[in-house]
Amino acid sequence: MQNLTVALDAMGGDFGPRVTVPAAVQALSHFPELKVILVGDQHQITQQLSLLGYSADTRLSIVHSDRVISNSEKPSLALRHSAGSSMGMAIDLVAENQADACVSGGNTGALMALSRFRLKLLPGIDRPALVSALPTISGRKTWMLDLGANVSSDADSLFQFAVMGAALAEQHLQQAPRVAILNIGAEEIKGNDLVKRCAEMLTQTQAINFIGYIEGNQLLTDAADVIVCDGFVGNVCLKACEGTAQLFIDKLKKSLLASSIKGWIARKLFSELFTELKTLNPDQYNGASLLGLRGIVIKSHGSADVSAVVNAISEAVHEVKRQVPSRISDRLEAVLLERHY
């Protein structure tokens, strides 16, 4: 069994050690091969461990940091003043090969800037991209990128996102994933020059199973295994999907918990539906991977609870086991070789 180490930014996210420390302890129980390094204020971390009746040991260690990068801090400022920060030190542990992956729920822009600066990009990649799995009506997953690492992208970057997304999805599916570009229509004439140019590049690449365009109403229908878009569009779509799913879950939960005859009827009729809808809960898919780097970095939701952070750590574990950066490099090399000839 391969031992692996995850550096967890214990101060990242809205709740800091109150959530990250219990999540680390739970993750250790899920993965016997896992070691976690908690990076943050040692006093706060130790305090939370004491509440759990736990203490640092050979599988759970603490690296003290004096500073936290705030959510309002600009990436350029965070980059200049990252020394001693929990996020910066967690990324450094990966750069120094003391950890196999980093997980943080902190400032997304700062995380991308620091990761890109400390870990460097893979050869052939111009920009990293955030990717996450989305649930679909069939029960399968769809991987969508970019989800906000870049506000705007050119056609070459979208093409690289497609290559990276395909490499990641292939490790899960064990077959060539269906790759599509998010567009305002499925017809070839639809869309702006950006998506048309990227579609042309993907059509000419046999190493990618490109199936064309899909529309926003197909995101959760299992129409594609990988959906490619720029970060602005992707982030808006992701949050719209999450908000809609949460609305349905909350509405149904309110009906099921009602004490009136209406609530009793709802519990009888919709309890199975509620169980199905819970599979759409965004917390179950927490953990967006920052692809294109020489190391593994996972972005957790800032508002994530304990179970959601456990899911982000789990994603880090799976990516380490699947050697995702190496797989992306291999896929990119094959694609570039094909385009060269």
From Swiss-Prot:
- Where mainly located? cytoplasm
* BP GO terms, sorted: fatty acid biosynthetic process; phospholipid biosynthetic process
Disulfide bond residue pairs: none
This enzyme catalyses: a fatty acyl-[ACP] + phosphate = an acyl phosphate + holo-[ACP]
Provide the alphabetized UniProt keywords.
Cytoplasm, Lipid biosynthesis, Lipid metabolism, Phospholipid biosynthesis, Phospholipid metabolism, Transferase
Q: EC annotation? A: 2.3.1.274
> At the top level of its lineage, which domain of life is listed?
Bacteria
Q: Give its localization.
A: Cytoplasm
> In which pathway does this enzyme or protein participate?
Lipid metabolism; phospholipid metabolism
Please verify whether the record's keywords include Transferase.
yes
Q: Which InterPro entries match?
A: FA_synthesis (IPR003664), Phospholipid_synth_PlsX-like (IPR012281)
Instruction: Return any one Pfam family short name.
Output: FA_synthesis
Which EC class is the enzyme in? transferase
Q: Which GO terms describe its cellular component?
A: cytoplasm
| Molecular function terms, GO-annotated | phosphate:acyl-[acyl carrier protein] acyltransferase activity
**Quaternary organization:** Homodimer. Probably interacts with PlsY.
Q: Which family does it belong to?
A: Belongs to the PlsX family.
What is the documented function of this protein? Catalyzes the reversible formation of acyl-phosphate (acyl-PO(4)) from acyl-[acyl-carrier-protein] (acyl-ACP). This enzyme utilizes acyl-ACP as fatty acyl donor, but not acyl-CoA.
> What is the name listed in the Swiss-Prot or TrEMBL entry for this protein?
Phosphate acyltransferase
